[in-house]
Amino acid sequence: MMEKIFNNTQVAFSLKSDSELDRAYFLFKLIDNEPLVRIGTAVTNFALKAHLPVEGLIRASVFDHFCGGVSEDDCMPVMEKMFTKGVCSVLDYSVEGKEDEHQFDAAMKKTLKIIEFAKLIDAIPFAVFKPTGFGRLDLYTKVGNKDPLNFEEHQEWDRVVARYEAVCKLAFEKEVALLIDAEESWMQDAADELVTKMMQKYNKEKAQELVNVFVTN
């Protein structure tokens, strides 16, 4: 089915105008130039760190081709346009690998907001988050290996569990499917065990309301 769709460019690119397709082709030709990409990345990172006014330039060039927006409301025009062709969207707040408790709490709050938003929008069939958006990778690894935790680590893991509980509970109450994205294999055992407990708790009344994504080799 998918092969037939993409063999028919009139269907595959029906949401794009000729000028948008020309722009996309030009952009991918630039990206294919490795030295240019290295230089562009370095210049962009410097400009952002120096707080230079480059956001408008980024939005006008590469941003719109790869991103739907910078917020839920900002993504709405793109999501609504795609939904007219039967294409759904997922707002993936793909923060991962952080080390700070404030960042973990911020990721949880953003996920809660996305669940609330998904409840209202037919074009968003589910919400998703990454395990290391809610806790340290090293902590997941230690828990998965059944290594002993000190007092502070026990408290830290309790906070991770509480974040999972908060988003799973809201997803259940709002009847929004929730996916937990798989990450590195060496931390996945702890995430799998925690998600399984959440599935056992919240998937009793409705099948597949909470879904774990597994790592495959």
Give each language-model segment a name.
Residues 1-176, 189, 193-213:
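Alpha/beta catalytic barrel-like cores
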Residues 180:
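Carbohydrate-associated surface elements
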Residues 183-188:
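Short acidic, Gly/Ser-rich segments with clustered Asp/Glu that frequently serve as metal-coordination loops
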